[in-house]
Amino acid sequence: MSYKENLNPSSYTSKFATPSSATAAQRVLRKEPYVSTFTTPSDNLLAQRAQLARITPSASSSVPGRVAVSMDASSQNTALAELPKRKFTIDDFDIGRPLGKGKFGNVYLARDKQNKFIMALKVLFKSQLEKEGVEHQLRREIEIQSHLRHPNILRMYNYFHDRKRIYLMLEFAPRGELYKELQKHGRFDEQRSATFMEELADALQYCHERKVIHRDIKPENLLMGYKGELKIADFGWSVHAPSLRRRTMCGTLDYLPPEMIEGKTHDEKVDLWCAGVLCFEFLVGMPPFDSPSHTETHRRIVNVDLKFPPFLSDGSKDLISKLLRYHPPQRLPLKGVMEHPWVKANSRRVLPPVFQSSSK
């Protein structure tokens, strides 16, 4: 569960709201974005600059949930270095407005009282985790995400717990959820889609070189950072699988590759399929195998029944077709995605790739 994934923010009545009812794995339409009573120009400034700023009290900070920012790169770097080492309790934080609400808990804007560093604090209820039997999944998510360092992967700084709750200290992504951005615009143009694809491919290549398979790439699990860059934000279905081939079915139906639907073993190439589905959805506004029934969706996926609308360019269709191959070894490698002519011609990526590997 990413801090903005499958979250329907609700009104803020207490520091810790109650968990929402279970949501199905199949995608559902969201409610309108939460509009906080604390939304002010200061909050907007915060959203634009939080990743690069040291948070300090302002004249408006007497209102709960309201903070202002002043730039201090040195203080930010010091705070980042300290976060993984310190032991925390909930009393170490000023709790701001809620960012979202999910099946197992809630997410809040939070500020470390000691160094004024701002983050997203995900609060998970142990009773709900135990009820659903997903404690092992959370442990795996923490183990994986806390060790990843990439500009297109949401940072997990630390975690702590008390008798009733588990708290995940996450990077705050000021521009919010990519899925809502896609809903707002209907579909993305080629430049934005290609930029996201380059960022995604670079982040996934970083993961795969570390034997991490994500297995649940979709718009709901992606956030946008300070410059609008893509951030992979949910590692709930990821696995750290050195030399293992998996059989577990997971993820969202529209994004499942043929080998998972058919119950076959799978490896990191499931992420290549998901990248192809994602690219199609960026450009078209809906997944490529979307159908009225689950049965029909399954049929279209296993037959790779891929139909392109006429407005797609030849370059984008070529990339998608090379990713959506039935046989996993035939799918375009991530290095090939980043070097694809359509991506190179259209991507406007700002951050340089931080991970270079030899081609496989």
From Swiss-Prot:
It is found in: Nucleus; Chromosome; Chromosome, Centromere; Cytoplasm, Cytoskeleton, Spindle. ATP binds at L99, G100, K101, G102, K103, F104, G105, N106, V107, K122. Coiled coil: none annotated. Pfam families: Pkinase. Keywords: ATP-binding, Cell cycle, Cell division, Centromere, Chromosome, Chromosome partition, Cytoplasm, Cytoskeleton, Kinase, Mitosis, Nucleotide-binding, Nucleus, Phosphoprotein, Serine/threonine-protein kinase, Transferase. The active site is at D216 (proton acceptor). Its main location: nucleus. GO terms for molecular function: ATP binding; histone H3S10 kinase activity; protein serine kinase activity; protein serine/threonine kinase activity. The keyword Ribonucleoprotein does not apply. One of its GO terms (biological process) is negative regulation of B cell apoptotic process. It catalyses: L-seryl-[protein] + ATP = O-phospho-L-seryl-[protein] + ADP + H(+); L-threonyl-[protein] + ATP = O-phospho-L-threonyl-[protein] + ADP + H(+). Kinase activity is stimulated by cell-cycle specific phosphorylation. SUPFAM superfamilies: Protein kinase-like (PK-like). Residues 93-343 form the Protein kinase domain. GO terms for cellular component: chromatin; chromosome; chromosome passenger complex; chromosome, centromeric region; cytoplasm; kinetochore; midbody; nucleus. Its EC number is 2.7.11.1. The keyword Kinase applies. Belongs to the protein kinase superfamily. Ser/Thr protein kinase family. Aurora subfamily. Serine/threonine-protein kinase component of the chromosomal passenger complex (CPC), a complex that acts as a key regulator of mitosis. The CPC complex has essential functions at the centromere in ensuring correct chromosome alignment and segregation and is required for chromatin-induced microtubule stabilization and spindle assembly. Involved in the bipolar attachment of spindle microtubules to kinetochores and is a key regulator for the onset of cytokinesis during mitosis. Required for central/midzone spindle assembly and cleavage furrow formation. PANTHER family: SERINE/THREONINE-PROTEIN KINASE IAL-RELATED (PTHR24350). Component of the chromosomal passenger complex (CPC). This is Aurora kinase B. It comes from Xenopus tropicalis (Western clawed frog). The gene is aurkb.
